[in-house]
């Protein structure tokens, strides 16, 4: 067979349609640039709200920490102005500080309470209006935690007419703890859910050694 005959016997190549190559008509959506997480509200406000209202400087004189050298402060703050520790206990808060906090704290934060203790607002109000006869103890929780807040867990009451009550360790029938608590509760408008878990007569250093009743809720 000749070369000419061999070429003629081969099938012809198919003719492809003339379809132009075009880019796709749709494009994938743009990938959003990463953004910082928003300051979502926590228990009583956005992260750092205690720093913004100046809470930690107000607590500084009342921090429950070891003694410092002259010129030193027991309060350790980071670059944001937040305490280095997320738990900051205080004791002996006076009337002036309590009144200042009533004006600075958000309304929601004033509703805080330590379990069945009086609300923070009731405790601060009692302290602010007692001219030194009522002091507060508690703690602050820093911005490191979701439950950033101020809590009052105890009050110290030094009213002279309340010092004659007898409170016994075993709380026997002769113990007057319930009668004492009712007097304190009614006098200062304390909205506690129950009697304090502990009532002790004390002479704290932060009260200049004056005698008073320390009432604490677990």
Regions found by a protein language model. Name each.
Residues 42, 55, 174, 199, ...:
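Intrinsically disordered, low-complexity regions enriched in Ser/Pro/Gly/Gln/His and often acidic
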